[in-house]
Amino acid sequence: MNKTNDHEIDQLIYLFSKLPGLGSRSARRIVLYLLQDKDVRLKSLINNLVEIDKKIVKCKICGNMDTESICSICSSKYRDKSVIAVVETVAELWAMERSGNFKGLYHVLGHNLSAASRQNPSILRLPELLKRCFAENIKEVIIATNSTLEGQTTAYFITEYLKEHPAKISRLASGIPIGGELDYLDEGTLSAAINLRQPFE
């Protein structure tokens, strides 16, 4: 990374460069943009980050991010509470919400499993999922993990873990390419995948 001869600015560039999808060049442009109108752009960002740090918490039911300990999705009376979509991270939850085509509940695993690294399945929130399935009388579990090798491995472990529950288990269908991640799909493709989901064997 090219240095600016200012430690504080270099540190800020470094922090931005670690964000997903950003490299050092993009990070430098962002920092320069903020500093060019520091009183408005930078202070607005700082104030917003402080508020987020104070107010945003993880939903104690599904793992979503919200200002309440039970998020607006879990507490909504308009959601179909007999269906749960299991996603890897909040990013996939947001992607499904953008599609506007899923009206059920969610369960955020927080991780995926890599067959190569031999991760322990205990890193997933599967006990909480099984408990919810029984307590909330869930009729269908939609496995909405990514179509990557890690996502497929994770889907297998979810299916094995839920064998003792009678809920129908399905998987997002057509339109998701092998290796594809939900967060990068357009709303139409993701809507089709939800509508055409199939039983997962």
From Swiss-Prot:
Key words, A-Z: DNA damage, DNA recombination, DNA repair, Metal-binding, Zinc, Zinc-finger
GO molecular function list: DNA binding; zinc ion binding
Gene3D superfamilies noted in UniProt: 3.40.1360.10, 6.10.250.240, RecR Domain 1 (1.10.8.420)
Xref: NCBIfam families: recR (TIGR00615)
Entry protein name: Recombination protein RecR
Species classification: Bacteria, Pseudomonadati, Pseudomonadota, Alphaproteobacteria, Rickettsiales
Keyword Calcium appears in the UniProt entry: no
Keyword Acetylation carried by entry: no
Family in the record: Belongs to the RecR family.
PROSITE patterns referenced in this protein's UniProt entry, alphabetically: RECR, TOPRIM
A biological process from GO: DNA repair
Origin: domain of life: Bacteria
ZnF C4-type span: 59-74
Residue ranges constituting the Toprim domain according to the UniProt record: 82-177
InterPro entries, A to Z: DNA_Rcmb_RecR (IPR000093), Rcmb_RecR (IPR023627), Rcmb_RecR_Znf (IPR015967), TOPRIM_dom (IPR006171), TOPRIM_RecR (IPR034137)
UniProt function note: May play a role in DNA repair. It seems to be involved in an RecBC-independent recombinational process of DNA repair. It may act with RecF and RecO.
Source organism (scientific name): Rickettsia akari (strain Hartford)
